[in-house]
UniProtKB/Swiss-Prot annotation:
Keywords: Ribonucleoprotein, Ribosomal protein, RNA-binding, rRNA-binding. Residues 197-206 have a biased composition (Polar residues). This is Large ribosomal subunit protein bL9. Binds to the 23S rRNA. It comes from Bartonella henselae (strain ATCC 49882 / DSM 28221 / CCUG 30454 / Houston 1). InterPro entries: Ribosomal_bL9, Ribosomal_bL9/RNase_H1_N, Ribosomal_bL9_bac/chp, Ribosomal_bL9_C, Ribosomal_bL9_C_sf, Ribosomal_bL9_N, Ribosomal_bL9_N_sf. The keyword RNA-binding applies. The keyword Ribonucleoprotein applies. Residues 182-206 are annotated as: Disordered. One of its GO terms (molecular function) is rRNA binding. Gene3D superfamilies: Ribosomal protein L9, C-terminal domain, Ribosomal protein L9, N-terminal domain. The gene is rplI. One of its GO terms (cellular component) is ribosome.
């Protein structure tokens, strides 16, 4: 299908270019998202009439994207997920997860602006590209860890999937389990003591 580009599309062309693309790409992505028009005579005339307005709007959007890029480029975001000792996530981190965590920090980023070929499935520091505008791309760091403390260690350069780190994780898990067991035993002992006291009170009254 021949289309008229309404904005710059990487590896395809600039605004106003008439290019040929696969029908599915045009129908499912370019046309519904307002990035292109079918290249028929009516649309060609319409585009030429609207060209100045479209170019002005594009410059405005680019300027806004550049302002956001100044604050966002290179910024790090922490994502806490459950993972095994080797760092393999029990789930994954998707484009939706990334857009939501960045948006929660005060930046409006849609999932379609996150360039991620496959969901993240391991802990670690992951460099992710964001497309703020067809002509403005930046990168951010997604720090995926099992806890905030682990994220801090990763940010300081530690590799949490090393043998030493795995040993530390095991020790932390063991310590947590011991603390939980101790707390449970304390609660059981307290409950038993209260029950014994109640029984003694009943016997004394009798």
């Amino acid at each position: 299908m021949d289309i008229i580009l309404l904005e710059r599309i990487p590896r395809l062309g600039q605004m106003g270019d008439i290019v040929s693309v696969k029908d599915g790409y045009a129908r499912n992505f370019l046309l519904p998202q307002g990035k292109a028009l079918r290249a028929n005579e009516a649309n060609k005339k319409h585009f030429e009439i609207q060209r100045a307005q479209l170019e002005a709007r594009n410059l405005e959007r680019k300027s806004e994207a550049e302002k956001i890029a100044e604050k966002l480029d290179g910024k790090s975001f922490i994502v806490v997920r459950s993972a095994g000792e080797t760092g393999q996530l029990y789930g994954s981190v998707s484009t939706r997860d990334i857009s939501e965590i960045i948006t929660s920090e005060g930046f409006s980023i849609g999932r379609n602006q996150v360039e991620l070929n496959h969901p993240i499935k391991t802990i670690g520091l992951h460099t992710i590209m964001l497309s703020l505008h067809p002509e403005v791309q930046i990168s951010v760091i997604i720090n995926v860890a099992r806890s905030a403390s682990e994220a801090q260690r990763q940010a300081e350069g530690e590799t949490l999937t090393s043998a030493e780190a795995i040993y530390d994780v095991r020790k932390e898990l063991l310590a947590e389990n011991q603390e939980e067991t101790f707390a449970e035993n304390q609660q059981k002992a307290l409950a038993k003591e209260m029950n014994d006291n109640d029984a003694n009170s009943i016997n004394e009254e009798a």
